[in-house]
Amino acid sequence: MIQLKENQGIPRSILLMMSIIAGLTVANCYYNQPLLELIRHDLDITEQIANLITVITQIGYALGLFFLIPMGDMFSRKKLILVNMTIAALMAIVMAVAQNVWMLWGASLLIGACSVIPQFFIPIAGQFSTPENKSRNMGFVLSGLLTGILASRVISGYIGEWLGWREMFFIAALVMVVCMGIMMLMMPEMKRNYVGTYRGLMTTVAEIFILHPSIRIYSIRAAFGFGSMMAIWSCLAFHLAQPPFNAGSDMVGMLGLCGIMGAVAASSVGKLVPRFGIHKFSLFGAAMQIIAWAIALLFGDTYAGLIAAIILVDIGLQCQQLSNQSGCLQEIPQASNRANTIFMTTYFIGGSLGTFCAGYVWTQADWLGVCIVGISFAFISLMISLSHKK
């Protein structure tokens, strides 16, 4: 078995494996988005109740980030990942057989919490890569994660339309079992970065948050960028179900292909961050999201307008996420999992807030309200970047 040493480099095979599994595991959090209209009809629930499935999944992810990712500094990361995969597979089966919304909500919470596996991988890429390749390799893993997000929407949209939404979650459980087998064969064990109690570990997370203002800035402005992006996806299925589209879940999935530009951008941003700097990329990303939402507001009743908005809001987010996450992990490399916990927990709180706000205003002001939420979140991110030079 290969042994990894800090700053000494990672074999390409391990990076590729982490990138692929990052995509397959994070997909668990996004299968539900194109299926919301189908679930709503099947269980006879309102749009706002159905939207909470996505909100609760994001909350679960944030909880997993906060309580589980710090353990990567204290326990075997390989074993933690395998346990999370097992629970995610079981909860996908619960989703598939759920007969009421309470089962869906409970399973969604645990699926979200146990799908944080990519956030073990990204610090691994940062910790063990050679210094000149850290941002590039983190971007490579992140591009796999983003490809998983966009592929999950496309695949679940089509499977939901032609086989049914429950079948999608049975398939998700099978995918997790396959990933477990690959992990057991390929993933090496890694040296732990912390010796002590779990309580002491979590205390250091709070200390890092208090003592490192740069980490707070990186995390909060990226969180508002993620909230802006989640606003469009949380209500897209409802928007497309209305005239002039009258489209099904397969069309929601097709629009997920637009996100491929975001995946491509992640790899490019990882190479360019050291040259142009974190601050410039964060500013650029927030500005691009504002432009995207202006297009969604003016041309959101056309496929061309929606496609342009989705592409731009996604590329804008990747510029914000990778640049700010890279800065966060480089701030304290010896505590990379804990720094990543702060960043990603804040990030997904922002995503949950964007999802909730968009879902609420959809019932009050339809697509106009969703666009206002998206623009507002992107504008806040822009203002934070303008008021801080890091």
Place the predicted regions along the sequence by residue.
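Structural signature of the two symmetry-related core transmembrane helices
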Residues: 80-93, 280-294, 375
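Helix-loop-helix hairpin linking two adjacent transmembrane segments in secondary transporters
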Residues: 103, 140-187
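Intracellular juxtamembrane helix-capping segments at the cytosolic ends
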Residues: 117-129, 319-332
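C-terminal transmembrane helical hairpin of 12-TM major facilitator-type secondary transporters
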Residues: 279-324
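Conserved MFS/SLC helix-loop-helix module at the cytosolic interface between two early adjacent transmembrane helices
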Residues: 63-101
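Juxtamembrane intracellular "pre-TM" segments in multi-pass secondary transporters
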Residues: 2-8, 187-220
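Helix-to-loop junctions at the C-terminal end of transmembrane segments
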Residues: 65-76, 264-278, 362
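Cytoplasmic helix-loop-helix junction between adjacent transmembrane helices
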Residues: 107-144
